[in-house]
UniProtKB/Swiss-Prot annotation:
GO terms for molecular function: ATP binding; glutamate-tRNA ligase activity; RNA binding. A motif ('KMSKS' region) lies at residues 460-464. This is Probable glutamate--tRNA ligase, cytoplasmic. Belongs to the class-I aminoacyl-tRNA synthetase family. Glutamate--tRNA ligase type 2 subfamily. It is found in: Cytoplasm. NCBIfam families: gltX_arch. PANTHER family: GLUTAMATE--TRNA LIGASE, GLUTAMINE-TRNA LIGASE. It catalyses: tRNA(Glu) + L-glutamate + ATP = L-glutamyl-tRNA(Glu) + AMP + diphosphate. Keywords: Aminoacyl-tRNA synthetase, ATP-binding, Cytoplasm, Ligase, Nucleotide-binding, Protein biosynthesis, RNA-binding. Its EC number is 6.1.1.17.
Length: 764
């Protein structure tokens, strides 16, 4: 990247840790780029000179606001007047904080950030920068954060994420008097100078923040936007449904509008109140603040009246043609023998349908559109069909139900929806949606638009197929960690924050792509890394006893940090003794006389190894060598004392894909490509620290990875922890055996083309 011309010069007093240090202006300059930063000790004020003019600005906040306004593409000052005002409101609040309110304020911010990656919207703004700077510069706030510790996990996550961004790291180094290691100019006699390059917007954990302008939606009026999320209560929400909910909510939030949750309950054969309750639970977990919950069944009488209106206007008719024949006629543009029935005849047949008589159940009500239309969706589609199954809300009041394509535009219009956003699997129905609005003379005409459907390799998002897995017992239920339902994938450890960022990072593009599920978990790792305490687990079946001749003969219990990089997480109890348990797979790679490092303790020398008939190490002896250099050892080993007050046995689980083929094609037999062995588990030893964990707590077993607490032990049932992937899914439970040595097979060397030619010539 070529160096861009500087647009301004920022001069400030660079005395480390000074109360007047312009951290807000420096971070903003780093984010925006193109600012020459000059620090000199003793300057009276912070000043920003605009290159090419005689103008200058003074004051850290004033300079930051100017830089944010000059780079609107970064949205540092929000995306509209409302978000800019909210940013100003936050900045004013942060600036006038009183010390006696610090505790209350931090708890408030933690709750506010529960389901947010940033303070305003979905991008970094000045509000984030100012709050970060206040925390960094006010010692009393830092002390209060340390006191609150794990009780403010969401604020800690937010702060930890910003702390690792390059712009913040460089500014923090300057604040602490450290020399920059990147993009630094040479130190002059009078001070230091650094010129930054023009940079693109900050990346999130998933990549660039998605482009939501791609849909080019008209009529996005502040305070007037009304969207909806219309799930069918025929199963649990999966991540595809989550995308629909999050994108519709994005526009409602961005334009200070509303989102309505509407259950499309038009097929009683598949629907259950259980599904309704769990979908509402999932929507709440996504942090969506909906205006109200409605049901299509609230409008059954109204939709019925529109159907009668169509019959009377001669644009709907009843048809008892068998389904297979009707499909063939539609494919071949052949009109039904009932197409020109009289209005009276159609009303009579529709009445039979409503009574679910023997003749009535053979019929459907069809819209009379255009059987010769090039778009087959217009070839007299069905709009009502019979179903005698009792409805979970209305019981047996109705025997006929509207189809989704007919009911949806009616209810959208009546509920005042302005924008209906749905995945492009419905793209071929968009014109039909608008046509119903026209022929029914509905005044409110929502704008309908499509975005790409989520698709992952080796993952099915079809509710029918997911239901098959549940019904056949392949999985334990809709919340099984192998399923892509929200409740399933969060049991596997995916955080809602990571899921939301992933979906928003995709933007609203209509281009379909199939992704690796591991990409979801890469972003999840960025959320977990700064927030998870560290513990130790040793595989039980292969644990090796290591006896130290000079170790503590009586167990010594010490308080150690749960996470060395974040003391605010508190401490854990660690037992030190002369009898340790080590990972068998680690020990199989150790040689007698080798010096190794016992993590968080020091070095030890292995003197003897005892092996079984298979050649596996079963026990070792050695001695501590704490004066040894941990940097010079090849092996850093996890360990537990076998003399712990409470050695707790836990179950560690991991899962493989259910589907063995990356993408199923039409005609593929589902059972042929179903993995019948996709759940794996081992027992492991841990210590008493595990007894403090609660359901869904997330931790890291050092060197093993992140785990989610799926079951809390009670003396009868064990603790169960599920492995959380941090990238591509490892096959066959391999994640449970991270220390097993894998023999690498050398790849065959292909001779270069010139070598091949020489070989041929020599043969000739």
């Amino acid at each position: 990247m070529s160096k861009a011309k500087d647009t301004g010069i920022l001069r400030f007093d660079d005395t480390p840790l000074a109360a007047t240090f312009p951290l807000v202006a420096i971070i903003t300059s780093k984010v925006v780029g193109g600012v020459k930063i000059v620090g000199r000790k003793g300057l009276d004020s912070t000043e920003f000179s605009i290159v090419g003019t005689q103008d200058s600005l003074k004051g850290s906040y004033v300079i930051a606001k100017y830089l944010a306004r000059t780079t609107p593409s970064l949205s540092l000052y929000g995306e509209n007047a409302l978000s800019a005002s909210k940013i100003d409101e936050f900045i004013d609040k942060f600036a006038h904080l009183k010390s006696e309110k610090f505790n209350e304020f931090l708890k408030e911010m933690n709750e506010y950030l529960t389901l947010r990656a940033f303070l305003i919207g979905f991008n970094l703004t000045l509000a984030d920068i100012v709050l970060f700077a206040r925390i960094k510069m006010v010692k009393e706030i830092q002390e209060e954060i340390n006191k609150l510790g794990k009780t403010i996990p969401h604020l800690n996550r937010w702060y930890g994420y910003l702390s690792q961004l390059e712009s913040f790291v460089e500014a923090d180094n300057a604040f602490n008097g450290k020399k920059e290691t990147k993009a630094s100019g040479k130190a002059g006699a009078e001070g230091t100078a650094a010129t930054t390059e023009k940079v693109a917007p900050q990346k999130g954990a998933m990549g660039w923040v998605g482009n939501f302008e791609a849909l080019n939606l008209p009529g996005l009026v502040e305070g007037k936007v009304v969207t909806r999320f219309p799930p069918e209560p025929s199963g649990y929400m999966h991540i595809g449904h989550c995308k629909a909910a999050i994108i519709n909510n994005y526009y409602a939030e961005k334009y200070n509008g509303k989102i309505i949750i509407r259950f499309d309950d038009t097929n009683p054969s598949k629907e259950k109140e259980e599904y309704v309750e769990n979908i509402i639970k999932d929507i709440n977990n996504l942090g969506i603040k909906y205006e109200k919950i409605t049901h299509t069944s609230d409008y059954f009488d109204l939709i019925h009246d529109y159907a009668i209106q169509m019959i009377k206007e001669g644009i709907a008719y009843c048809d008892d043609t068998p389904q297979v024949k009707m499909s063939e006629e539609r494919d071949n543009a052949i009109e039904s023998v009932h197409r020109n029935n009289s209005v009276e005849k159609n009303l009579e047949m529709f009445d039979e349908m409503k009574k679910a008589t023997e003749q009535g159940v053979k019929c459907v009500l069809r819209a009379k559109l255009d059987m010769a239309h090039i778009d087959k969706a217009f070839r007299d589609p069905a709009i009502y069909r019979c179903n005698s199954t009792p409805h979970h809300r209305t019981g047996d009041k109705y025997k006929v139900y509207p189809l989704y394509d007919f009911a949806c535009p009616i209810v959208d219009s009546v509920e005042g929806i302005t924008h209906a956003l749905r995945s492009n699997e419905y793209n071929n129905k968009r014109n039909l949606y608008n046509h119903y609005l026209e022929i029914l003379h509905l005044e409110n005409k929502p704008y309908i638009s499509d975005y790409s459907r989520l698709s992952f390799f080796n993952v099915l998002l079809s509710k029918r197929k997911l239901q098959h897995f549940v019904d056949t017992g392949l999985v334990s239920g809709w919340t099984d960690p192998r399923l892509p339902t929200l409740q399933g994938i969060t049991r596997r450890g995916l955080t809602v924050a990571a899921l939301k960022e992933f979906i928003l990072s995709q933007g609203a593009s209509a281009a379909n792509t199939t992704l690796d599920l591991g990409k979801l978990f890469v972003g999840n790792k960025a959320v977990l890394e700064p927030t998870c305490p560290r513990y130790t687990a040793i595989a039980k079946a292969t644990a090796v006893k290591f006896t130290l001749s000079n170790g503590p003969t009586l167990p010594e219990v010490k308080d150690c940090l749960k996470y060395a990089k974040d003391p605010s997480m508190g401490t854990k109890k660690v037992t030190f003794s002369n009898n340790l348990l080590l990972e068998g797979d680690d020990c199989n790679q150790i040689k007698e006389g080798e010096e190794v490092t016992l993590m968080n303790w020091g070095n030890a020398i292995v003197e003897t190894l005892q092996r079984n008939e298979n050649g596996d190490v079963v026990s070792m002896t050695g001695k501590l060598h704490l004066e040894g250099d941990v940097k010079k050892t090849d092996k850093k080993l996890s360990w537990l004392s076998s003399d712990c007050a409470d050695t707790v046995t836990v179950v560690l689980q991991d899962y493989d894909y259910i589907i063995t083929k990356p993408k199923l094609e039409d005609g593929d037999d589902l059972d042929t490509f179903t993995n019948k062995n996709s759940k794996f588990e081992i027992e492991a030893f841990t210590d008493e620290n595990i007894l403090t964990l609660k359901l869904n707590d997330k931790i890291q077993f050092e060197r093993r990875g992140f785990f989610n607490v799926d079951q809390v032990g009670d003396g009868v049932k064990p603790y169960i922890l599920i492995y959380i992937p941090s990238g591509p899914i490892k096959p066959a439970g391999a994640a449970l055996y991270p220390f097993k040595k894998v023999e690498k097979v050398a790849a065959p060397v292909n001779p270069k083309p010139t070598a091949k030619k020489q070989e041929k010539q020599s043969k000739k």
